[in-house]
């Protein structure tokens, strides 16, 4: 847990980036206004987390999940954000699923490559053994001819 109230503030760089993305080009914001928005955002996050935690506790869980956050948004009377949040959550889940599938495919491809390399190595070893046998047979034949 935070030891000082300042520890609860969101990073200034993040707040500044969000503000710049939200404002039209050419619009500036004072340091004081940026600080006020930062504090307001921090309070909002803390309040939303507290509300979501209440839903988790009702469900006898210690871990907050997305449905807790969505329920908290409704309880805080931010219903108009629920649909965009659900859409963002679905996009996030699709992205994570795609990453997971890509990772699994990469692992399968790597395993196939490793298996193929092992088969090639085994074939090479078999060929080396065959060559050694042929050389040995040739030497034996030469020795027999000499005898």
From Swiss-Prot:
Keywords: Acetylation, Coiled coil, DNA-binding, Nucleus, Phosphoprotein. The modification N-acetylalanine is found at residue 2. The keyword Phosphoprotein applies. Gene3D superfamilies: Histone, subunit A. Residues 85-146 form a coiled coil. One of its GO terms (cellular component) is pericentric heterochromatin. This is DNA polymerase epsilon subunit 3. Residues 125-147 have a biased composition (Acidic residues). The keyword Nucleus applies. GO terms for biological process: chromatin remodeling; DNA damage response; DNA replication; DNA-templated DNA replication; heterochromatin formation; leading strand elongation; negative regulation of transcription by RNA polymerase II; nucleosome assembly. Component of the DNA polymerase epsilon complex consisting of four subunits: the catalytic subunit POLE and the accessory subunits POLE2, POLE3 and POLE4. Interaction with POLE4 is a prerequisite for further binding with POLE and POLE2. Heterodimer with CHRAC1; binds to DNA. Component of the CHRAC ISWI chromatin remodeling complex at least composed of SMARCA5/SNF2H, BAZ1A/ACF1, CHRAC1 and POLE3; the complex preferentially binds DNA through the CHRAC1-POLE3 heterodimer and possesses ATP-dependent nucleosome-remodeling activity. One of its GO terms (molecular function) is chromatin DNA binding. Expressed in heart, brain, placenta, lung, liver, skeletal muscle, kidney and pancreas. The modification Phosphothreonine is found at residue 83. PANTHER family: DNA POLYMERASE EPSILON SUBUNIT 3 (PTHR46172:SF1). The modification Phosphoserine is found at residue 122. SUPFAM superfamilies: Histone-fold. It is found in: Nucleus. Residues 93-147 are annotated as: Disordered. Accessory component of the DNA polymerase epsilon complex. Participates in DNA repair and in chromosomal DNA replication. Forms a complex with CHRAC1 and binds naked DNA, which is then incorporated into chromatin, aided by the nucleosome-remodeling activity of ISWI/SNF2H and ACF1. Does not enhance nucleosome sliding activity of the ACF-5 ISWI chromatin remodeling complex. Residues 93-124 have a biased composition (Basic and acidic residues).
């Amino acid at each position: 847990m935070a030891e000082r109230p300042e520890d609860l503030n969101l990073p200034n760089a993040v707040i500044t980036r969000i503000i710049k993305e939200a404002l039209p080009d050419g619009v500036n914001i004072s340091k004081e206004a940026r600080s006020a928005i930062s504090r307001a955002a921090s309070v909002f996050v803390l309040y939303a987390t507290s509300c979501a935690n209440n839903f988790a506790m009702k469900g006898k869980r210690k871990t907050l999940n997305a449905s807790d956050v969505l329920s908290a948004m409704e309880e805080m009377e931010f219903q108009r954000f629920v649909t965009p949040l659900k859409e963002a959550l679905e996009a996030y889940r699709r992205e994570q699923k795609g990453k997971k599938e890509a990772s699994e495919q990469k692992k399968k491809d790597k395993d196939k490559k490793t298996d193929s390399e092992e088969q090639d190595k085994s074939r090479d070893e078999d060929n080396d053994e065959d060559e050694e046998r042929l050389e040995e047979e040739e030497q034996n034949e030469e020795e027999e001819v000499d005898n």
